[in-house]
């Protein structure tokens, strides 16, 4: 009930009390290449009903993803585990901040059941930050991966994890040992914007997390993403690409930042589709196996199709 109330609140000060002191930022009108249609399809409704029936949260809803109509219409959803309330207060994010509830021991099984009901070939599992937990929720991630493997055999699993900043190294080791097919952790923005955009995180810690995941399991695909339009410049984006490649990241996503409410970080500008195409070309030139760079790209957007292409790209490179 608490989660539903939080999700349904429309007043930014109530959903994001940590941002109440911030001055309002204007929300510029979105250009034509950003606008999407309201979700109305039967597929969308069926996906929604399965998610509701299993009492699950999705980042699609909690973060206000613009692609929810398209993805849910195709029966795809990104499961968000460990509750709907985050212990961090990143200025770009629309997920509610506050004191989370205790973990639900039955959630991994319900996620697996929903994956089976939806008939997913590839599933993305993410979470809120849980700095209140000793392991940051690592074991809960591992249990969810194992439950999906048991209930939906043949489904590939992608995890989008928090940074485990306040945990020991065993947290990351626990997740990687559960053998997800893709290990994703987003850097989100250039390091110079971290104090404003991602104040509870550390750029080089996140970078090392990605590098260490690859060291623990060289066969795992690693993935990371950033938003643009936050105030970064092209040189900064290029440096992040270089840092990711040095950490062994295989798959890069770049998407346009969209401001959830006036209390959130302002949109500095809308990056044009041509600029995104230029970023994609540059990223492939730096050696990424897979790149998705469009205004509406999000971490799990077209994740299933992209995983198939990612796997094919690795095989092609190994055969070259």
Curated annotation (Swiss-Prot):
Binds 2 [4Fe-4S] clusters per subunit. One cluster is coordinated with 3 cysteines and an exchangeable S-adenosyl-L-methionine. Residues 1-29 have a biased composition (Basic and acidic residues). PROSITE patterns: RADICAL_SAM. It is an enzyme of class 2 (transferase). Residues 71-289 form the Radical SAM core domain. Residues 1-32 are annotated as: Disordered. [4Fe-4S] cluster 1 binds at residues 60, 65, 71, 300. It catalyses: [[Fe-S] cluster scaffold protein carrying a second [4Fe-4S](2+) cluster] + N(6)-octanoyl-L-lysyl-[protein] + 2 oxidized [2Fe-2S]-[ferredoxin] + 2 S-adenosyl-L-methionine + 4 H(+) = [[Fe-S] cluster scaffold protein] + N(6)-[(R)-dihydrolipoyl]-L-lysyl-[protein] + 4 Fe(3+) + 2 hydrogen sulfide + 2 5'-deoxyadenosine + 2 L-methionine + 2 reduced [2Fe-2S]-[ferredoxin]. Gene3D superfamilies: Aldolase class I (3.20.20.70). It comes from the Bacteria. Pathway: Protein modification; protein lipoylation via endogenous pathway; protein N(6)-(lipoyl)lysine from octanoyl-[acyl-carrier-protein]: step 2/2. Signal peptide: none annotated. It holds the Pfam family Radical_SAM. One of its GO terms (cellular component) is cytoplasm. Keywords: 4Fe-4S, Cytoplasm, Iron, Iron-sulfur, Metal-binding, S-adenosyl-L-methionine, Transferase. [4Fe-4S] cluster 2 binds at residues 86, 90, 93. One of its GO terms (molecular function) is metal ion binding. Its EC number is 2.8.1.8. The keyword Iron-sulfur applies. Its cofactor is [4Fe-4S] cluster. It is found in: Cytoplasm. Belongs to the radical SAM superfamily. Lipoyl synthase family. HAMAP family: Lipoyl_synth. This is Lipoyl synthase. It comes from Cereibacter sphaeroides (strain ATCC 17025 / ATH 2.4.3). The lineage of its organism: Bacteria, Pseudomonadati, Pseudomonadota, Alphaproteobacteria, Rhodobacterales. The gene is lipA.
